[in-house]
Amino acid sequence: MKSLTLIGLAFGASLALSTAALAQDIPVAVAGPMTGGESAFGRQMKNGAEQAVDDINAAGGVLGKKLSLQVGDDACDPKQARSVAEKFASAKIPFVAGHYCSSSSIPASEAYAEGNVLQITPASTNPLFTERKLWNVARVCGRDDQQGGVAGQYIAKNYKGKNIAILNDKTTYGKGLADETKKALNKAGVTEKMFESYNKGDKDFAAIVSRMKRDNIDLVYVGGYHQESGLLVRQMRDQGLKTVLMAGDALADKEFATITGAAGEGTLFTFGPDPRNKPTAKAIVEKFKAKNIDPEGYTLYTYAALQVWSKAAAKAGTTDPKKVMDTIKAGEWDTVIGKLGFDAKGDIKVIDYVVYKWDAKGNYAEINPKGS
């Protein structure tokens, strides 16, 4: 790629954009947790964006110009995300693929809207991101009311008559997903025995594990991220609990297995059908493998976000964010994760969550793989 710039952690860090590069290239950005507890997903996003920019540039770029990629680190912190967004907006970057955490994407989107920046998130699933109907937002992933619905139905079908617990980490993503799962579960006629919260960043779950043990919990659904979920499942096993842990898409990184070790076997989570298995992704997956990168989780979703924007800009004949967004919503776009169309709010029109299971070797696979 032509250039790669990282926006650091400090709020006062300057946006290191080369004037010469800007004169020749079109600056685009990826923003997410490049540091902090969710940095594994930031790496996924950065890998996906870098490969997409390389491939777009190799094919001639956009409107006759190469793309230059900027990287913003929000550490999944809302204030830091807003700061990153303001810097990108002041630099007149027309497009950002980001962010990862919903608690980052939502405040960042307001700064992008004010600064005339188009934002497509590969990963933020909280419904509020698009329900506010900002002109500048879209996502290439599903929503928690859809993901929670699949999880709730799965639990109701497979754990009927069992003792269920629901936990959440109080974050925008975690609490929202837990609430949607509870809603679907209750609608199916199942009432959870335990509903509790913890704080993101907690490491000691002894009190929660003790209550689960006392209440004979068969399955615990966690609305939260992979670090805390991994520690929880380890502590459950240490206390002799065979309780199954189920969570959402935040478990779609092999760092979860690094945290859990053998204790993670049998853990369930929801995510879209594995894009690595799609025929549309075969050539791109091979490129990643040649670099010794596993394009898991949101890697290919980030790649797809860049594809949608670049194709729409080419069709619109401009990088003007509002004109490109109008073009995005008016069309359908062939991407590495399949054909995508968007509704008026910026949500994709076809959603298809499935359930995955972690195995003893630290790998995950769809329980009922669809492969396309």
Segments (PLM) and residue ranges:
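Extracytosolic ligand-binding ectodomains
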Residues: M1-F11, A23-S372
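Sec/Tat signal peptide C-region and signal peptidase I cleavage site
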Residues: L17-A23
